[in-house]
Amino acid sequence: MLVMAGLGLYDERDVTLKTLDFAKKVDKIYAEFYTAILTGTSMEKIENTLQKPITVLDREKVEYETNKLIEEAVDKDIMFLTAGDPMVATTHVDIAVEARKKGIEVVIINAPSIYSAIGITGLQLYKFGKTTSVVFPEPNYFPETPYDVIKDNLKLGYHTLCLLDIQADKERFMTANEGLDALLKIEEKRNENVISGETYAAVVARAGSIKPGLYYGKIKDLINYDFGTPLHCVIIPGKLHFMEEDALKYLFENI
């Protein structure tokens, strides 16, 4: 049996009772934290909560050695843990599919993810369009996909959730400041008047924690603001309902 369980967003207290129950029964627990990470806790605290040791896999081992993980689940009960929800990342979906192809029982335990946590903004979830990811610019790699996604969503009046790059192995987490700067750099190159310093944006910091940071304002005012420790994400709002306007006014710190 393969149990795929999410750990939630922030700390070990996000672990569900269902995950705790299965953790007691399984033979071995694996985890990966390259797609997301719980910044409010430590591996030691998670292991203490589950009362079992955890083998952490890096990106390469998850993506290229999943066969070993799946083969173990043929005659053993294996748990695979991820931050957030276990079925958000494509890699995790692939693991579940390959396990089922081999006739392995797959149990999926859902958990809070950024897709549910953005409800804290008061923005209506059905008005979010396609999600995009903003990555750290590299000398030969600076994708403009986020710009195109925002452009297409704005045409339809939709909000855009921008996930920010995570390089957990380097302990490097893109800040909202860096994400906004990257978007402005793409605008500077494309010059299609999609984003500017006058564009309003929302920043969510430490989603899932007891005291998340919610900030709203023009990009020119947000870009140098200190949003505190990661993880951050950015939302470019589309057409706002009056209730959403109230949410941005009263639930957020307006910069």
UniProtKB/Swiss-Prot annotation:
Keywords: Methyltransferase, S-adenosyl-L-methionine, Transferase
InterPro entries: 4pyrrol_Mease, 4pyrrol_Methylase_sf, 4pyrrole_Mease_sub1, 4pyrrole_Mease_sub2, Dphthn_synthase
One Gene Ontology biological process: methylation
Top EC class of this enzyme: transferase
Pfam families: TP_methylase (PF00590)
GO molecular function, one term: diphthine synthase activity
Annotated S-adenosyl-L-methionine binding sites: L9, D85, V88, S113, I114, L164, A207, H232
Pathways per UniProt: Protein modification; peptidyl-diphthamide biosynthesis
Recorded superkingdom: Archaea
Transmembrane segments: none
CDD domains the record matches: DHP5_DphB
Catalysis: reaction(s): 2-[(3S)-amino-3-carboxypropyl]-L-histidyl-[translation elongation factor 2] + 3 S-adenosyl-L-methionine = diphthine-[translation elongation factor 2] + 3 S-adenosyl-L-homocysteine + 3 H(+)
EC number(s) stated in the UniProt entry for this protein: 2.1.1.98
Family of this protein: Belongs to the diphthine synthase family.
Subunit note: Homodimer.
Job description of the protein: S-adenosyl-L-methionine-dependent methyltransferase that catalyzes the trimethylation of the amino group of the modified target histidine residue in translation elongation factor 2 (EF-2), to form an intermediate called diphthine. The three successive methylation reactions represent the second step of diphthamide biosynthesis.
Protein name, as recorded: Diphthine synthase
Organism ancestry: Archaea, Methanobacteriati, Methanobacteriota, Methanomada group, Methanococci
